[in-house]
């Protein structure tokens, strides 16, 4: 039996084919599902959205970092999982104002998740060992260690509250050691893109 709220990870990873009936033709539409996501009782984080990364055709036009397929045209019959973007309905009305920044801004969340759906990865290094590597497959984007950034933000919040400002929080130290300001929608930490 189905339950509500819905576990977004389980929904997105479901390979039984039972959710494909909710999709429209993936060659003509981007399917966006809006529902209440379950939350872990002891978690301090909230999932605002989640998306599938697209497929790339096998062969000379394959794009690194994407799932490979032999199909150049997907049909619903080719799918066993819900190829879509999922948005947490609890935050559907959240938005920033000219004077107040909201980390749950629906416009930013949707733009970010659509970026994933179209093949973009996070700009920060996503490694289990905390190393600063290029994991977004785009050589021209500045990358940084997000674990280190988050630790620095926590430290500033706890010990130097006067420095906990938007102007300071958009700054990053790149993997090359050079400071830069984040303007990239695929960086879901505080950024001018948001």
Can you annotate each of these PLM segments?
Residues 1-156:
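Metzincin-family zinc-dependent endopeptidase catalytic domain
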């Amino acid at each position: 039996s189905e339950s509500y709220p819905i576990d977004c990870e389980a929904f997105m990873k479901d390979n039984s084919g039972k959710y494909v009936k909710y999709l429209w033709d993936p060659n003509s539409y981007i399917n966006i599902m809006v529902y209440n996501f379950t939350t872990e009782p002891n978690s301090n984080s909230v999932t605002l959205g989640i998306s599938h990364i697209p497929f790339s055709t096998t062969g000379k036009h394959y794009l690194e970092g994407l799932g490979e397929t032999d199909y150049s045209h997907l049909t619903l019959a080719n799918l066993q999982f819900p190829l879509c973007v999922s948005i947490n309905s609890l935050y559907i009305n959240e938005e920033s104002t000219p004077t107040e920044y909201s980390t749950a801004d629906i416009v930013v969340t949707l733009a970010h998740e659509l970026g994933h759906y179209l093949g973009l990865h996070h700009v920060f290094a996503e490694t289990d060992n905390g190393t600063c590597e290029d994991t977004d497959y785009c050589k021209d984007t500045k990358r940084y260690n997000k674990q280190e950034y988050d630790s620095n933000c926590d430290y500033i919040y706890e010990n130097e509250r006067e420095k906990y400002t938007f102007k300071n929080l958009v700054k990053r130290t790149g993997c090359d050691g050079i400071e830069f300001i984040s303007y990239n929608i695929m960086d879901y930490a505080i950024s001018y893109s948001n």
